């Protein structure tokens, strides 16, 4: 009995030494912060301030163009533009998901998950990513035949995926509308009172938190016909026929991608990582996204001040007289820089942050909407000018900022400070993109 009393006293003593000892505020116990793993294929861009826009050294434009000093927080950025092979992983994921959805609808329940880990029913069933499609199964072939071109749409009886069906459904949370004070939850009345604007431009009353979740569907296959559509009276059929699927172009930047397709790619890439982290018991990190125009310019400068080009000086040739980017160097001459059209990413030297092709090769989408007066409207801390264009908006409202210049542009568009634009639903043979990811915590 005495030993039992001593044991109880010891337990009570040890308990008093826990996180609530003395009734003090000590925080929640058991939380573990792990260092952020550097994302594969990305380089770190530290936070800092710089002069956005042209500098005083650019005499031609210093008196007419807007510039201001801003600060940008640190982030990770893709070392190169997204390549054909990287984007193909996205396309193949969509093909696999659509195929499994068709098999589930065809009665093959092994391709779906109808119960969660607690035994609760899941409706509709979630796609089972671990299930494998058997290309030799005649039953599966019969169900999946509608995914391929049929009848007179086939070319020499080749079995080819109908790219018109490669639609990716994705969601995101509209924090901007959720942060509007008129849209906040009214605790006194125990309800929402505001209205929210959906992607189709329609306004509807806020029902609950789900009203701020946006749903979109985008066809993910690149517009391979852009090589012909972009240039009249120019023979570019070989690039249209082979550029995206031919292995020799795997390390070339993906083109023919609209802003919305690039946006969808970022959402898919985020979910790909989050699913992996969740399965391994790790906490999610910040999402992948397109860089803001300010982030892109800051990264292009490579930590230098007021430089005209990413390589640090005001010239497009090195000491040997060779061009140091892929662009249109001379009138009617595309080849003197070493590439007529796009070339493999990372061919030229990187800037001081280790980023390749921040000038030339292909121009790059950013997340910002294009407006000539945006510099005077945006904040000086992490400036960002966002606008989700509605289908009914005028074309000018659908413009997105494009940076860096491309293989078909003259040197002016290669400057760090020069933004231009393209319409968000337009695909070009000279526009690609790269992703960024915000840094977790401080430096």
Task: Locate predicted features.
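Short capping motifs at secondary-structure boundaries
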Residues: 75, 82, 91-100, 268-276, ...
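Coil residues (strongly favoring Ser/Thr
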Residues: 97, 153, 163, 175, ...
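Short, P/G- and charge-enriched loop/turn segments at secondary-structure junctions
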Residues: 30-32, 64-65, 388-390, 419-424
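Short, structured beta-strand segments at or near domain termini in extracellular proteins/domains
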Residues: 429-443
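Functional-site microenvironments in short loops/helix caps that host divalent-cation chemistry
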Residues: 18-24, 44-45, 51, 56, ...
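Post-signal-peptide N-terminal segment of Sec-exported extracytoplasmic proteins
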Residues: 35-66
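Non-catalytic, alpha-helical, charged scaffold/linker segments
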Residues: 102-208
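Bacterial Sec-dependent N-terminal signal peptides
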Residues: 1-28, 33, 38-40, 299
